[in-house]
Amino acid sequence: MRILLTNDDGIHAPGLGSLERIARMLSDDIWIVAPEYEQSGAGRALTLSDPIRVRRIDPRRFAVEGTPTDCVAMAMQQLIEGPAPDLVLSGVNRGQNLAEDVTLSGTVAGAIEGMAFGIRSIALSQAMTYFHDEVVAHWETAEHFGPGIVQRLLEVGWPKDVIINVNFPAVAPEMVTEVEVTRQGFRDSHMRSMEKRTDLRGRDYYWTGFVVKPSNPAEGTDLKAVYQGRISVTPLHIDLTHNQTVAAMKGALGGTPPRFDQPGLETAS
């Protein structure tokens, strides 16, 4: 089995080393194509306005000056010699990719790009108690459980238009309680903040920050599982259509385009 590895934390990230150790439990036919620089939060961004440069580290390991999506596309169309991969693994991300964060995640995007090429793709993330708290990161949890989970997923299979999003809880392996197949959750509080700073010349600048807030996610969600020490396995697909709203709106917007009648209309609550 040929496996392509990528990530969004960059070619030197410790999580990529963990991913390689997971992959080599499954196969010795491994290709690694990862960003030269960190691309956390890049989502499905493409490099369109600059050339994409590639550094070959060894015959099957490349660093790409681009996003995770660029990396997978480059691997598929320019870098991998011989047969296409049978599997794309993206990660292991430094921090969880849960709930609405999956739309921001370069790790998830790498898996989506693999799926777009018709390859079975899995995103893997290691949750942390605090953002980028690598001192106490439990990489051993992902490495301990990752091979078995990937193997079982391959045995079970999943639809071609679906990726699998795996999140390991921020605990040591012996503290993991079980694996749960979950749905994508949604946080009940906003956790990002834009923090204002001032440089030595008196000019303002801003950092994106994260605020730890109490949360009570719904049962059956990826959030709840990881918060309670379980490994979350979530099938995701790229179709973002909300079918219930489609059905509800058809009566109001179907047919002849509506005409603007008067200003100041109140919106529906």
Curated annotation (Swiss-Prot):
InterPro entries, per database record: SurE, SurE-like_Pase/nucleotidase, SurE-like_sf
UniProt-annotated location(s): Cytoplasm
Cellular component aspect of the GO annotation: cytoplasm
Cofactor note: Binds 1 divalent metal cation per subunit.
Signal peptide coordinates: none
Top-rank EC class of the record's enzyme: hydrolase
GO molecular function: 3'-nucleotidase activity; 5'-nucleotidase activity; exopolyphosphatase activity; metal ion binding; nucleotide binding
Protein name (database record): 5'-nucleotidase SurE
Species name: Caulobacter sp. (strain K31)
Gene name linked to the record: surE
